[in-house]
Amino acid sequence: MQRRIMGIETEFGVTCTFHGHRRLSPDEVARYLFRRVVSWGRSSNVFLRNGARLYLDVGSHPEYATAECDNLIQLVTHDRAGERVLEDLLIDAEQRLADEGIGGDIYLFKNNTDSAGNSYGCHENYLIVRAGEFSRISDVLLPFLVTRQLICGAGKVLQTPKAATFCLSQRAEHIWEGVSSATTRSRPIINTRDEPHADAEKYRRLHVIVGDSNMCESTTMLKVGTASLVLEMIEAGVPFRDFSLDNPIRAIREVSHDLTGRRPVRLAGGRQASALDIQREYYSRAVDYLQTREPNSQIEQVVDLWGRQLDAVESQDFAKVDTEIDWVIKRKLFQRYQDRYNMELSDPKISQLDLAYHDIKRGRGVFDLLQRKGLAARITTDEEIDAAVDTPPQTTRAKLRGEFISAAQEAGRDFTVDWVHLKLNDQAQRTVLCKDPFRSVDERVKRLIASM
């Protein structure tokens, strides 16, 4: 499948402080954040004009699920648009607090762990054909996903009883299964719950919940681009060496703690391979596969960065990627800070900097400041992100959903939507079922809109 439907779901950490002390509980902050949403949507679970879903997840975490996208830059743009949507809610909520005489600053973090050790996720969704053998997909994909933190981890300072250590991944410490139907209780790498949000006879949805939330656009593009390409190669029958892991959960932690990528992890049958070995195998297959594939500049960009990052890890010279990979950007920032102020990695100020990197408020968040200084690469523009806040992807089913929502809101009509249904809540209860996520034009939807 060379054209694939993809989406990213991001849960955000939330807190409210006043002069450095916690002001409100996460539940209370969430209520202020979503008050504007509830006022127009009559719910804290809504779909937006850009086709995305915005809702309050378990544990008072605001969650933004992008609309269906069919190319990488489009997906990165809509992922960033989610930050803008949440930032607008943050500003509105702070104003409400001020109006009620409650001083405080609200923070939304696009990260994966809080100070209490709780974890919240960034989930990737990839449409795959139903006819494929799912067990083979998961078998081949699992070693890739366990080791890809080398190329797309967000980075984290982990405080251990002995010392503080810099790790590749925020999520790695919180994954407890390889493949499972659970998402919260056991946190698998691949979730097998079968909810295709499409024609179930043709498709299923691969739900990957092991990834970190990325701030850097090029890292997000690398994360989803490499996963989609590996899926495409599996579907095309490309042979891969067997890197079945003896214990994926132990391996994911070992990889996260090794910035060199050289520490051996145990494979099934007593063999060993390093994370770098495993990533090199997938990368070399991708380079060969591109020679036979229809040209695609976005995929070529992804494979180029993939190779450069693996070279950087191997040589431990990150100069050629130090604006493109989250964990590399963050580690360089920490090292500069430590050198300037003569402090250890365990210093609380480094932990504060770690958190501030993921603050989504422009002008305050550390990543935003780095990006403005040209120290973090861009693949989209502020104008494109602003447009994506209100405009759905124009090449997928999201266009139909977004147009229906806009028309119904402007006509003052009561409606209900989900990923596949568009419904007018009138006497006729007219409903259109949109089972094809690739379809952006539908006469039935046009007629439904015209009838308003």
UniProtKB/Swiss-Prot annotation:
GO terms for molecular function: ATP binding; ligase activity, forming carbon-nitrogen bonds; magnesium ion binding; ubiquitin-like protein transferase activity. It catalyses: ATP + [prokaryotic ubiquitin-like protein]-L-glutamate + [protein]-L-lysine = ADP + phosphate + N(6)-([prokaryotic ubiquitin-like protein]-gamma-L-glutamyl)-[protein]-L-lysine. ATP binds at residues 53, 66, 419. The active site is at 57 (proton acceptor). Pathway: Protein degradation; proteasomal Pup-dependent pathway; Protein modification; protein pupylation. Catalyzes the covalent attachment of the prokaryotic ubiquitin-like protein modifier Pup to the proteasomal substrate proteins, thereby targeting them for proteasomal degradation. This tagging system is termed pupylation. The ligation reaction involves the side-chain carboxylate of the C-terminal glutamate of Pup and the side-chain amino group of a substrate lysine. Belongs to the Pup ligase/Pup deamidase family. Pup-conjugating enzyme subfamily. This is Pup--protein ligase. It comes from Mycobacterium sp. (strain KMS).
